[in-house]
Amino acid sequence: MVTPKLHLDLSLTKKMKDHIHEHDHMVQICGEVSSGETSLVGIKKTCGEAPCGFSDAKTSSIEAQERAASMRKLLIAVLLCAIFIVVEVVGGIKANSLAILTDAAHLLSDVAAFAISLFSLWASGWKANPQQSYGFFRIEILGALVSIQMIWLLAGILVYEAIVRLNNGSGEVEGSLMFAVSAVGLLVNIAMAILLGHDHGHGHGHSHDNGHGHSHDHGHGIAATEHHHDSGHDESQLSDVLIEQKKQRNVNIQGAYLHVLGDSIQSVGVMIGGAIIWYKPEWKILDLICTLVFSVIVLGTTIGMLRNILEVLMESTPREIDPTMLEKGVCEIEEVVAVHELHIWAITVGKLLLACHVKIRPEAEADMVLDKIIDYIKREHNISHVTIQIERQ
């Protein structure tokens, strides 16, 4: 005769096997079923994904190739910038031009931005672990904060020197050397713009969406845990996910490209100032005016970055997400009664997470409602990492 406890164990085992067949996940049962003891502690579940759910084994090869291509572009840009920074520093000192040194400081800010993007692409290949369950994306934020502080320090030194020279007068500025160095800088910026602007990335038609929601169904005083895994086999949804992943991977290249365009404009300004001073040396005050103007521009380029950093560190709701509209959209689902404990935050820029409690009608099927909610959040708000706790009314 089968005892009730043994019968319960066998039933649980059968349900787990059915769950394996349905969702194609790997489940290893380490504990032994005995008639004298029933335990679920020995059940070990292994999913083929990173703990944070940001990566997918089936697309890791494609992502690695595209990540390597982006890293090569950024590495070349960093090397070009680093070499020309040395040229500008030497040329600025010899020409006695603060404007060239300011351009070098701006270029240094670009090197910092490129290096952060490069490190971000490299670190995005690191796998999450139990200690760093969300991965290492926050390193990018910390690096950006350090680079901003360095840029502000350099800009402050240059502004101070420009003010001192305005008050006390400055030595002669060699307009010809100033023009030549800035002209070479413009050529370097054009080369980098061509490098970063020409995207060789190609789309691929296969992707697997591992986004998952976790629902905890609390009803009539009995707590049960349900895990929902969205396999995402619909081809149109796969295409949308792939396009969005492509945009996320290219955002570093696009940011670097915009930095280069800004540098090109500044190089043109220094060239014009150098040409005027070359033609009329007594107009050397233009060098100091260029220094003050471009220092303000350098500081201005860091404001947006600083705002993004503070929003991530304060775990503010990302600006591209309207939590009121999101909550309203979830509540418009027929089976949903209310939404509370809604939290939306970012691990780093572009990596969004959401957690909330959703109260549903007593007769509603939790899995079906969870499917609808996750589909809505991914489709309308592009949040791929969603954790939802289902509660009965």
From Swiss-Prot:
Residues 1-72, 127-138, 198-257, 306-393 are cytoplasmic. It comes from Arabidopsis thaliana (Mouse-ear cress). Residues 202-237 are annotated as: Disordered. Gene3D superfamilies: Cation efflux protein transmembrane domain. It is found in: Membrane. Involved in sequestration of excess zinc in the cytoplasm into vacuoles to maintain zinc homeostasis. Keywords: Ion transport, Membrane, Metal-binding, Transmembrane, Transmembrane helix, Transport, Zinc, Zinc transport. This is Metal tolerance protein A2. Its main location: membrane. The chain crosses the membrane at residues 73-93, 106-126, 139-159, 177-197, 258-278, 285-305. One of its GO terms (cellular component) is membrane. Residues 202-236 have a biased composition (Basic and acidic residues). InterPro entries: Cation_efflux, Cation_efflux_CTD_sf, Cation_efflux_TMD_sf, CDF/SLC30A. It holds the Pfam family Cation_efflux. Residues 94-105, 160-176, 279-284 are vacuolar.
